[in-house]
Amino acid sequence: GADISTSQPSPTAVMEIWDKALEEYEKILYMPISSGLSSSYNTAMMLAQEEKYEGRVLVVDDGQVAAPLHQMILDTLDMIEKGYEAEHIRELLEKAGDRMMIYIALQTLEFLKKGGRVTPAAAALGSVFNIKPILKLQTGKLDSFKKCHGMQKAKKTAIEAMQTEIRENFQDALNDGALHLLASSSGTDEENAAWVEEIKEVFPGVPILYD
C-alpha cells in the first residue's frame, strides 16, 4: 500500500488562504488540529501576530482533530448564524474542547512504529499476536488506553469506554439531548456502515456524525 505520512501546511499556504478570506471577511477563525499533535497551531499563532493579521485572524486551539474538529466547525457555523462575535466563539470552542475525547482503535501498529511510538520489535509482536491498540485523545493529548486481541474486541472495548465516559461525565448532556457522537473509519463502505449501525444500537436516539 501507499506510504502515508502527514505534515503541517506551509506558512505560505496558510497566509494565502488568510489573505484571500480577508478580502471578503472582516475576521477569520482559524482552527488547526490540536496543538498537542501538531505544530500547526504554534505556526499559526506566530503568523497571526503579523501586523496585517493582528486582531483579524483568531487562532483556535480546541484540542481536537478528525471528526470532533468537524463537529466544532459545524458548531461554529451555527454560532455565526446566531450572530456571535468571533472572540466569543473562540472562547466557547476552546472551553468545549475540554469536553470532547476520541477513542481510536488501530488496525495496525505500523504507523505507530514509523512515528516512533512503538519499537519495531513491539510492532512485530503485535502483528504476530493480533494485538490492536486503543488510543485516547483528550484535550489535545494522545495516550495509550488499552490493548486488545483482534479488531472486533477493540471496537467493542472502544464502545464500552464511551459508555463509561457518558455515564460518568456526560449523563446530563445525554438526558438533555445535547450529546453528540462522532464516528470515523478507514474501512470499506460496507464496514463503515456496519460500524455506524453498531454504535447506533448501543446509543439509540443519539445523533451520530460520521466522517
Which positions does each model-derived feature cover?
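N-terminal glycine-rich anion-binding loop in soluble enzyme alpha/beta folds
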Residues: 1-13
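N-terminal glycine-rich phosphate/adenylate-binding segment common to multiple enzyme folds
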Residues: 13-41
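Mixed-charge interfacial surface used for oligomerization/domain docking
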Residues: 27, 36-40, 44-50, 54-58, ...
